[in-house]
């Protein structure tokens, strides 16, 4: 029987770093963000759906999605956020299910990194859920530094996600990412050894 572990957190919580450590330990990880980027690539299913919905102003000079512009258009308007979620989630869910079913054929244990795992009701897909947790202030600082956001813009982005403190009750394991990389890696390696 295959064991599937869902990995979640919030924006700038450190999920990518955790995913990297898990992969380096020999486990397969389906990364929802990478799946979305492929679907949003020129000619992809999401690319087509977004282009039909918002028109060519979401494209850059090369005909690719202008992600910052797209993000601004979606986050600036609550109706756009709802439409975007409805439009994108079914396409993303379908692709993630396909990749999950493929890995079930070859892996005893694998992970799926899904930022909105709880919000988009993926919980039943998993035997365990690992939450990458970081304090809100640290999350804000990382988001501002990583994306060059003002504090106001970073707070706006966080306000559109379920707080990490609320996600704790869904987690089988909480990975505390408030410390340094060595401490983070030790936590993950300990958890992987218990599998």
UniProtKB/Swiss-Prot annotation:
It catalyses: 3'-dephospho-CoA + ATP = ADP + CoA + H(+). It is found in: Cytoplasm. Pathway: Cofactor biosynthesis; coenzyme A biosynthesis; CoA from (R)-pantothenate: step 5/5. InterPro entries: Depp_CoAkinase (IPR001977), P-loop_NTPase (IPR027417). PROSITE patterns: DPCK. GO terms for molecular function: ATP binding; dephospho-CoA kinase activity. One of its GO terms (cellular component) is cytoplasm. Its EC number is 2.7.1.24. ATP binds at residues 12-17. Keywords: ATP-binding, Coenzyme A biosynthesis, Cytoplasm, Kinase, Nucleotide-binding, Transferase. It is an enzyme of class 2 (transferase). Residues 4-195 form the DPCK domain. The keyword Kinase applies. One of its GO terms (biological process) is coenzyme A biosynthetic process. Belongs to the CoaE family. Catalyzes the phosphorylation of the 3'-hydroxyl group of dephosphocoenzyme A to form coenzyme A. NCBIfam families: dephospho-CoA kinase (TIGR00152). This is Dephospho-CoA kinase. The lineage of its organism: Bacteria, Bacillati, Bacillota, Bacilli, Lactobacillales.
